Each structure stands twice: as structure tokens, then as C-alpha cells.
Amino acid sequence: MIRAEVDSANALGADDSFDQGMPVSFSLKQNYPNPFNPVTTIEFSLLQGGMTDISIYDISGRKVESLLGRRLVSGNHFIKYNASTLPSGMYFYSIVVSGMNGESLFSSTKKMVLMK
């Protein structure tokens, strides 16, 4: 079950740019607000398009959510995550971007805190 919303002019699950300028590098920004309850925003930039996976992990490293798993174009993107069914605690969100041939283009992980 996916409990994420990628804001878009397209259907739920599509991508949207939050800035018209093109990024100069790949990046995963800190979610905001942080701590959050229960919705937070995760922004990320893709220097080039690719298969983009974003997942949420608990403190023990167990994957608790897959937020995104689709090909996105280069640009600046954001996703809103609703963690209403998860207990309070520290979580990690991770992005992995792969190229056309499956090669790793970018990966990063950041910490977030859910406080209910």
C-alpha cells in the first residue's frame, strides 16, 4: 500500500517540479517539517532522469513503506508522505536512482522523526 502523494498536474504517483531551474547535481533534501505529525514533504533533485525509488525504513532497518518506484525526468521534485499509521519514532528515508542500463546514478539516506 502506498501512502504517498507526489504532487503533479498528472495523476497520483506522477512527478512535479517545485522549481523551474534545472538542478546542478543529484540531491536529497531534509524532510520538512521535521519532527512531523503525520505528513511531511521530501524534496529531491535529479541531475538526469532515471528509475527513482524512495523508501522508508524503521530504526532497525526494516522497510516499512515504498513511496515511489518509477522513472522520473531530470529536475526538482517533491513527495508528500503521510505516516498516520506508523508509531512515533525515528525513521530513515532513502532514494536510489538508476540509469537506463541499471547503473547506479545516485543514492542517499536521511533521518526523520515522527512525533504523535
Question: Which ranges hold each PLM region?
Answer:
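Ordered hydrophobic segments in well-structured contexts
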Residues: 1-4, 41, 111
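Short, compositionally biased serine/threonine- and acidic-rich segments at solvent-exposed termini, linkers
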Residues: 1-19
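Glycine-centered coil/turn sites that cap beta-strands in beta-rich domains
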Residues: 15-32, 36-56, 73, 78-81, ...
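C-terminal tail/sorting-segment detector
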Residues: 66, 74, 80, 84, ...
